Amino acid sequence: MKTEDNGSAPALAGDHGGVDQDTPDAGDRTEQAKHKTNGTTEKAPKSSNAKDPSRPRRKKARRACFACQRAHLTCGDERPCQRCIKRGLQDACHDGVRKKAKYLHDAPDGALMPGVGGNFYNNAMRNNLPLSRNGATTVNTTSQQNSGSSYYPTPQSNSYNVYQDTPLTQNSFPSQSPVSPTFNMKTTPTARSNSLSSSVNQQPPNTTVSGATQSQNPFAGPFFDPSDPALFNFDLSSMNFENRYGALEFGMLGHMATGAGDSPTDSATQRGSMGRSGSTQYSTTPITGAPGFGESPGNQQPFMFGNDPLLNEWPNSQAPNQGHLNVSGVYPQGGMMHMAKSDAPHAFAIESGPASFSSPSATTSPHINSGYDESSLSNTVVNKSNGLTANGQRPAITTPSLKHQSLQFGVKRRQRNPSTVYESVKEPYAYTNRFHNLTAFIQRRFSPQKTLQIAKALASIRPSFIATTKTLNRDDLIFMEKCFQRTLWEYEDFINACGTPTIVCRRTGEIAAVGKEFSILTGWKKDVLLGKEPNLNVNTGGSSAPGSGTTSRGSFTPRSSTLENATPGRPQPVFLAELLDDDSVVEFYEDFARLAFGDSRGSVMTTCKLLKYKTKEDMELAQSDDNQRWNNHLRKGGIAGEAGMNQLGFKDGKVECAYCWTVKRDVFDIPMLIVMNVSCQCF
């Protein structure tokens, strides 16, 4: 075999011609000629036959080089490959460009490299990088060649910066990411100021990875380079993906999700971007000492993500004659409370860093001091130290850090903490007494025939009430009331946000919540409906059953003196039956008996007549002839504004409406409340 090897050398050297002779048939003919020249009579080895199935096959390369790819020949994994060495093309031997699928057309070529042998960014390489004198780590990729394969980056991603984490301490960061292991919740404004002053003359440590050692601006390149694996700060080789493009996409989503808490808090700059230009200003508020970040929107070099604490609040020397306008100095803290609602859902904004990632609430939130505040706007502490400069230059707007700011309410607002619901409810609700009050009201107002119809409807669901409540003890009844109050707490926000006239009442028919639009439509005040003010209504819609036999049934609905004396000072909400005329009340209780324990998702859509709130003076005024002209005007020209809504039904005391209502049940599957939406049918 040594003779065969020596004889094959001229054949390899003669392969530099333009004719390619690397096919298996040509190799067989060459070996047969060598055997004849040496005078041997032995046949060619069995393995030299290309069609022999026992012949060892050459291992397929993961990616062919450019020359072998164009010649459609078998290549190897080594670079340069053996064929390029034979042809003298070892200097130009590099991986060929593989045709990509349609969904990978926007992927860089380097991201599709299979295997884990490429020179991608990883944590092991980053931890072994030596530091230079100015804090930057320089790595030459030409000196780190992997024995398996090499990655040839695209020209646009020839160099990029990698921020190291080993030599940096906590004092080097003005703020830290809450997801990092070294995040400290007890960072004081003084410590933040000291860390900022110590890092003024320092440059951010960077690692330049390129073909030659060079220094470039990390933000002078493209807006976002997806071929930069160091952008995602994790080892892509350890990810279980078929190609690196999937790992890059996964890392992008994770980076966007975890980096939202450290974005700059300056709302005056461009949204979603941040600059590192010479016009960046840095100031400190006189009250909290918290740093404020501001910049001129004119000179701005945006970068994609702001999760690096060194870049969020990067300090620079303040330009002379450059004024600062602090938002807390222009807008008083008490005057901004109409925007900082305590009853709004507490969430972490994208452009503000949360103090913690725990579930926010109205009492634990560091931004808002919830509760009642009787102080007026004049007594609110106002920061007026930062203002416009006298030279007339346009000031740079800065926003102080909200982490150390305690906002106070300048107006009295209702406390919107759901925890108060569970703390305030101590006794179960007296549904039995309320049903007795409802029965007494129905007997006083309605005729015997209509009273019998309502009684039959309520009697049909009475056994179901008894069956569902007989196993409930006192604690269950208290918990039932807590469920009602907690559900009502949610519905009050919906009522305020919805422009449709809406009322919410208990299963007894007592009004529990009402919207402003319903009060405008019917004239019933909210405090009157909830029982906080006396009910002076005398409008009952008249008797719908002529000849009922009782002349004492006028238009006045008196309160039972025995019931009022039994519960002195207790609010007496208005019943839903007091808001409807006789026929509408009968129809309502017949539908309620069907939905109370029937279809839990069912609803009723029908028409009704709502009774206007009228006192004795209103009833006397309605009898005059002047109002007839107003009613004719409503029929012809319609209504306009709130004043026109108040005049609906002023003559006869009834407003024709269409309403939709449904029944909500509690955890014991008992009817808990009734939600009703009303729409006027005046046109």
UniProtKB/Swiss-Prot annotation:
This is Transcription activator of gluconeogenesis acuK. The gene is acuK. Transcription factor which regulates nonfermentable carbon utilization. Activator of gluconeogenetic genes. GO terms for biological process: cellular response to starvation; gluconeogenesis. It comes from the Eukaryota. Disulfide bonds: none annotated. One of its GO terms (cellular component) is nucleus. It is found in: Nucleus. It comes from Neosartorya fischeri (strain ATCC 1020 / DSM 3700 / CBS 544.65 / FGSC A1164 / JCM 1740 / NRRL 181 / WB 181) (Aspergillus fischerianus). Its main location: nucleus. Belongs to the ERT1/acuK family. Residues 38-51, 131-218, 264-287, 314-325 have a biased composition (Polar residues). Pfam families: PAS_13. Residues 354-366, 540-555 have a biased composition (Low complexity). Residues 65-93 bind DNA. Keywords: Activator, DNA-binding, Gluconeogenesis, Metal-binding, Nucleus, Transcription, Transcription regulation, Zinc.
